[in-house]
Amino acid sequence: MDFLTLDLIKTHCRIEGYSEDPDEQRKIDETIKKCANQAEGIVYEHIGKDYPAIIKEYGEIPTRIMQAALMATADMIFERDPKENYAFKMILKPYKKKE
């Protein structure tokens, strides 16, 4: 995971539910890393491009690609009732920074 790092996710996402408890925060960070690793694999499987190729083509990883990949990991990571609204227990809201 050279390109979609924990730092990149924190830079490009609003992460709600941060904890002052170091142990709880470590668990949150581990979950984010797990999401990022799985998201990178999902992107490659579906569009056949790795992150270096995407960055070469677009100059960055487009927010929609990151958002879709992170959302696709939710069912793999979090247990949820299919009748419930689709949501992370910890909300990741990708956005594009204004320049």
Predicted features, each with a name:
Residues 1-99:
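Divalent metal-cofactor coordination and adjacent catalytic microenvironments
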